[in-house]
Amino acid sequence: MIYHGNRFTIKASATPEQVEAALESLRNQGRVIPSVKSFVVGPDYGGEYHYGAVFAIEDLEGYWEYLVHPAHLNTDRVGLPLVDKFMSFDITDDEDPRMADKIAELHQRRYDTMPDITELVSELGEYSGSAAPASTANSHAADPRPN
């Protein structure tokens, strides 16, 4: 199982209606994307981020389905223009030592084939973590597991 999560701050210029539309789009992803087994979307407490979401996805094939599903693309198009700071992460019980690279490759393939999404991501104030484009500074931390 892969738990794909993100945490983000909202720009001061975003209206409450825009924010709710983006959050509802995130919730809709969880409801309609077949590979999502469970999800949570809501306020992020205890840190510098305003909101977060976590989606439980069975495997890499399901992860790709999630990334390119129209519901996810809608969230990107509706939500990313409202976001200032974005951080993504993936937690998995899969012991494949290449899992981080495989996840990064899926995200990069999406950026390579969807220029409008890549442009939206490039306009974020800050983007770090497992889903960040390779060109983003500090996008992929070293694997913390012992060799």
Model regions and ranges:
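Short S/T/G/P-rich N-terminal loop/turn motif that feeds into the first structured element of a domain
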Residues: 1-50, 60-65, 84-147
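Mid-chain, well-packed structural core segment of small domains
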Residues: 60-79
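Sensory beta-strand/linker motifs that couple input domains to effectors
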Residues: 56
